[in-house]
Amino acid sequence: MPNDDAYSKPSAPSEAPQTPGAPPQGKAGGGGGGSGSDSGASGTGAVSGKKSPRLPKCARCRNHGYASPLKGHKRFCMWRDCQCKKCNLIAERQRVMAAQVALRRQQAQEEELGISHPIPLPSTAELMVKRENSSGNPCLMIESSSSSQPPPASTPSTAAPGPEGRMVIQDIPAVTSRGHVENTPDLVSDSTYYSSFYQPSLFPYYNNLYNYPQYPMALAADSSSGDVGNPLGGSPVKNSLRSLPAPYVPGQTGNQWQMKNSENRHAVSSQYRMHSYYPPPSYLGQSMSQIFTFEDSASYSEAKASAFSPPSSQDSGLVSLPSSSPIGNESTKAVLDCESASEPSNFAVAPIIEEDE
């Protein structure tokens, strides 16, 4: 075709240095008479080092001897509907390339989603079949006998005699096309391993309270002190007795009394809860100073701060009193026996309330 040489790369003689006085048209490597000036222009561009970018040309026009740029030419090509041999070959090539581009785009999307992966080699397939056969999977009925041959590299399926003498054919790429089957037994673990990380909350109305081990303290009602009223039927106290540490509570020889009256729920101010050096308030009784008769005097401030820090405003009347105090003997009959266990357990508080005298 005469026009191909006009737009092709200049030949070896044209790349030689130009002799002085020689015309630029003489540097064309070949071509027709009408394209000599164009080839000479391309030769001078090659010598000067400034090559113009190659513009795509219409393939149908090139097949029929014309060179026309492809930009804006597709709708106006004279051989757009040509059915000659060369144009049919071009149309077939365009369809194949479009199908390859679509397939490549689909594979890229599936790899991003983790749906598909490349088909393994026959050696990997044989290893997977042997592993599944050793694990006793009934899906692949392959016996390791002398008559069974390993699958050849060209065929993707394996044939082995079954127990009844029939041939069982399994397609290996179909088995391995759903995720990484050979790595599945190593990656899947027991669900109980993950369930141990997430513990259900003991208190469904609070997000921060979980069943952490608490002090070994169990509180139960003691009926040996006389007249005991009816216990309150329902759930135990929302906030457990978190104020007193465990070593001091079983150290008391007497019973621990709980004063919780619905009429005497005083909200202790923040200064008595934050600062332990303030004296006890007068409205809580004169015998409040007897609470802090513990064995160790170093824990006085801790016990005093914990005694004056109720868990909430509803339980602000919950005060721990020794059995020798007159308030405990006269005004309340709720007896709570403090027992210490060797292992941590939750508090079980069962308050018993009798009306004020």
Swiss-Prot record:
Keyword annotations from UniProtKB, A to Z: Activator, Developmental protein, Differentiation, DNA-binding, Metal-binding, Nucleus, Phosphoprotein, Repressor, Sexual differentiation, Transcription, Transcription regulation, Tumor suppressor, Zinc
Sequence ranges of Low complexity compositional bias: 38-50
InterPro entries, alphabetized: DM_DNA-bd, DM_DNA-bd_sf, DMRT, DMRT1-like
The entry's DNA-binding region: 58-105
Compositionally skewed regions (Polar residues) per UniProt: 309-332
GO molecular function: cis-regulatory region sequence-specific DNA binding; DNA-binding transcription factor activity, RNA polymerase II-specific; metal ion binding; RNA polymerase II cis-regulatory region sequence-specific DNA binding
Residue numbers bearing the Phosphoserine modification: 323
Top-level division of the source organism's lineage: Eukaryota
Biased composition annotated in UniProt, kind: Gly residues: 27-37
Pfam families documented for this protein: DM, Dmrt1
Disordered: region residues: 1-54, 138-164, 305-340
Localization per Swiss-Prot or TrEMBL: Nucleus
Major site of localization recorded for this protein: nucleus
GO biological process: male germ cell proliferation; male sex determination; male sex differentiation; negative regulation of meiotic nuclear division; negative regulation of transcription by RNA polymerase II; positive regulation of mitotic nuclear division; positive regulation of transcription by RNA polymerase II; regulation of transcription by RNA polymerase II
Function text: Transcription factor that plays a key role in male sex determination and differentiation by controlling testis development and male germ cell proliferation. Plays a central role in spermatogonia by inhibiting meiosis in undifferentiated spermatogonia and promoting mitosis, leading to spermatogonial development and allowing abundant and continuous production of sperm.
Family listed: Belongs to the DMRT family.
Protein name per Swiss-Prot or TrEMBL: Doublesex and mab-3 related transcription factor 1
